[in-house]
């Protein structure tokens, strides 16, 4: 089943590998997070922003650096950047500009990247972490955000080992990014993990970005220093495990240099899977030649823009989690966190709760358990990609209500869910049609005496063929009766409630004692 468990870090441990901060070498760490924006078009052209298409199929003249082509700012990218900035409590700047960062690399055909070095779109934000929601050991921790800036993504460089060629794909060139730069406020890995997870959840919730590390939609750089010394940047870390390993490696590298009386040089390093490796000196050097971009106008925003965007924002994740663990939902915290990280499931839950609890008056625990344990669990059990549209909330709600009204056994209901998950073609059938198709309806048109006789016949048959289980039950292992009940439910295709079989088995087994 999809796991809802969290890693629990001890107060001194920084990551699962046992990385501890040496009190003699105080760690200071900041993050630079590059986030691809979910826009239809690229940042400065009308090419599609889908960079996973066939190589070089979504490339305009501007994207490939053709001389004479001019940029035109995509307003959707600006809006998504502003949404993120406001949600992160940032000061949106009424005046911002674009600058050119010059460097030569094959995946940057213009010879420069358009970014916002001098006047970014937002400054001075923050994100609050707390021990209740964010798996940190401290009661609370504020991570300050220095700035948020809009910039272009680069193309992709791929080495073809068969053709022995370096191939350039410019589909990703000029895809809009925001770069978030934090202050060096992180003191351990648990804080870093918590911040990244919370940020991922936020941008997904706002529909600003897919939030995926694996696909490169979010890419992270570490800035690491010890005892207030020079800052070293570690580039392009694509997972939490890489972050933890790279931080541990760089922290110990700087400690070793300090112990041997060597200076820690301000530079950019990469991660090769085992250690950080030098790439280049830091960008404070003059070779980047930052200059204002003369082809793009200044961005002048109305001072009221922040309030207007804030008013249009949906409830943010922490507020929703607080609502979900309170009346009337009363979800467990781990389930609330899971729902907030999966917006489609959250909306599904709201609809299901309305149908089962508000409209039908059933217990809230029933709706919670059937969605989390039975429906989502069925997808995991049968290794089917999670697609809750196969079983709309109206259909699951009907199943839950029938079980609650004793019109359908729990076993039959689970069987129906399993079939809906495994057989997408059944999606169009009604619940009654599904019950008839799989013959899982409760036994009808039978007297109580006839039902009792049929149940006893099944139980007697099962007992006769499972004497070893009976021996376990009578010698002090009463839970073994569940095995017999399971056999009986299977024998009757789930048409009789399990408690009926349980009572009959206990009655018959009592004669053995």
From Swiss-Prot:
Reaction(s) the record says it catalyses: L-glutamyl-tRNA(Gln) + L-glutamine + ATP + H2O = L-glutaminyl-tRNA(Gln) + L-glutamate + ADP + phosphate + H(+)
Gene Ontology molecular function: ATP binding; glutaminyl-tRNA synthase (glutamine-hydrolyzing) activity
Location of the protein in the cell: Mitochondrion
Keyword Transferase part of the UniProt annotation: no
UniProt cross-references to InterPro entries, sorted A to Z: Asn/Gln-tRNA_amidoTrfase_suB/E, Asn/Gln-tRNA_Trfase_suB/E_cat, Asn/Gln_amidotransferase, Asn/Gln_tRNA_amidoTrase-B-like, GatB, GatB_Yqey_C_2, Gln-tRNA_amidoTrfase_suB_CS, Gln_synth/guanido_kin_cat_dom
Leading EC class: ligase
Major localization listed first in the record, in broad terms: mitochondrion
GO cellular component labels: glutamyl-tRNA(Gln) amidotransferase complex; mitochondrion
Keyword rRNA-binding: no
One GO term (biological process): glutaminyl-tRNAGln biosynthesis via transamidation
Matches recorded under PROSITE patterns: GATB (PS01234)
Pfam families hit by this protein: GatB_N (PF02934), GatB_Yqey (PF02637)
Family assignment from sequence similarity: Belongs to the GatB/GatE family. GatB subfamily.
Function recorded in the entry: Allows the formation of correctly charged Gln-tRNA(Gln) through the transamidation of misacylated Glu-tRNA(Gln) in the mitochondria. The reaction takes place in the presence of glutamine and ATP through an activated gamma-phospho-Glu-tRNA(Gln).
General remark: This protein may be expected to contain an N-terminal transit peptide but none has been predicted.
Protein name per its UniProtKB record: Glutamyl-tRNA(Gln) amidotransferase subunit B, mitochondrial
